[in-house]
């Protein structure tokens, strides 16, 4: 499979956006309750894909694995840009 010079469109449907946001909140809470640095652990998972960054506590690992990492990144970027006042 080769690369192309054409721009590829990536779209995440609206129903997943809210679910991803809720899942990230739940996972953050679970990580915090277990004494981990939630931001570091979530970043580790998103960058590596290794589910060991997220504990099984409160089913956090299974929750975050329901979504592709690119979907999580898209939601994080969207949330950040909205927070910067960019109309999406």
Curated annotation (Swiss-Prot):
Q: Which InterPro entries match?
A: IreB
Coiled-coil stretches: none
Q: Per the UniProt record, which residue ranges are transmembrane?
A: none
By sequence similarity, the record places it as follows: Belongs to the UPF0297 family.
NCBIfam families in UniProt: PRK05473.1
Q: What name has this protein been given in UniProt?
A: UPF0297 protein SGO_2042
Name the source organism: Streptococcus gordonii (strain Challis / ATCC 35105 / BCRC 15272 / CH1 / DL1 / V288)
Lineage per the UniProt record: Bacteria, Bacillati, Bacillota, Bacilli, Lactobacillales
């Amino acid at each position: 499979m080769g690369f192309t010079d054409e721009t590829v469109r990536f779209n995440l449907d609206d129903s997943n956006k809210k679910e991803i946001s809720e899942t990230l909140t739940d996972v953050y809470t679970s990580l915090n309750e277990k004494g981990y640095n939630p931001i570091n652990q979530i970043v580790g998972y998103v960058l590596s894909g290794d589910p060991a960054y997220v504990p099984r506590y409160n089913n956090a690992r299974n929750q975050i694995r329901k979504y592709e990492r690119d979907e999580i990144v898209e939601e994080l970027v969207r949330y950040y840009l909205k927070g910067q006042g960019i109309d999406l």
